[in-house]
Amino acid sequence: MVARPMDIIFDSNSHVTLTTLDLGYSHIGRHGAKYLVDALQNNQTLTTLCLRYNELEAVGTEYIADLLRNNTTLITLDIGDNRIKSQGAKYLADALRTNKTLMVLDVKRNSLEDEGVQHLTDALKINMTLTLLDLRSNRIGIRGAQYVADTLRNNTTLNTLYLAFNQIQDSGARHLAAALQDNKTLTRLDLGHNEIRDQGAQYLGDA
């Protein structure tokens, strides 16, 4: 049998100390994602995985989510720029409900929109380990901001949240500001480039 390239590169017997794997901008696609996950199933050392800009889409993201369900070492996952959309977000959210180790999740520039954000924020009402979530450039509107706000009211682990380059506007800022009055753990919130004007700034300032 001819070995697949991913199996050769990630043979767990020869890479027992691998902790960081950066495959960003490698165009591995959905099929490459499956090979990668198969090769990493038994890995017990990897803590950081970067898959940015790899054309994974929702199908490839489902394979990554399967890895998250069983993995007990991965701390950081960068899956930005992969067009995973709301369905891909749902796969990740389902995995986050059971994963106990992931602390950093980067899903920027994935066209998640409000529906995708709802999937992730619902999972964060259960997940108690994630500390950083990057949602920049995901076409998140006022409704999506409300989903985020609802989660922030009760979440006690998230300390960093990136929401820049969306369409949250003043009304979305009002939802977030109200949630910040209850939240005791968030220390960094990036809301740049969100069409937030004077009124939105006042809401946030009052919080």
Task: Label each region the model flagged.
Residues 1-207:
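Leucine-rich tandem repeat or coiled-coil scaffolds
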